[in-house]
């Protein structure tokens, strides 16, 4: 996963975390994994007065990372992620290997991700070059 994040950053994309986990917990998890600094922003469930599926949660995450909310996409693993992307009017990539597994295909994402190595090409296809 981190190779894909680094490839996206090297190509000029902004990469951030928009999660419904409490911000402190998300920060702790990413820090313990040694990857917190790889993300330009992290917005948790309690960072703002709203959370996913409210699209403003995603938009504010993009802004805090220095990106354009109109040019973002959401990579996720839940029905809430799909609802957030739909509400935001942005492409949605759902992983087939998350908690809901193959059931993600039924949510009709713009792309279904089977391997993080494919993510940079999917991003270019869905939103264009950075």
What are these regions (language model features)?
Residues 2:
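Alpha-helical phosphate/pyrophosphate-handling elements in metalloenzyme active cores
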């Amino acid at each position: 996963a981190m190779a894909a994040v680094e490839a996206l950053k090297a190509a000029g994309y902004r990469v951030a975390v928009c999660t419904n986990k409490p911000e402190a917990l998300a920060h702790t998890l990413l820090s313990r994994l040694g990857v917190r600094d790889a993300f330009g922003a992290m917005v948790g469930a309690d960072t703002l007065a709203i959370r996913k599926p409210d699209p403003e949660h995603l938009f504010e995450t993009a802004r805090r990372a220095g990106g354009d909310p109109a040019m973002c996409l959401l990579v996720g693993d839940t029905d809430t992620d799909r609802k957030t992307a739909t509400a935001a009017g942005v492409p949605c990539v759902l992983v087939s290997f998350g908690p809901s597994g193959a059931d993600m295909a039924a949510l009709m994402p713009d792309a279904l991700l089977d391997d993080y190595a494919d993510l940079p090409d999917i991003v270019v296809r869905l939103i264009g070059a950075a």
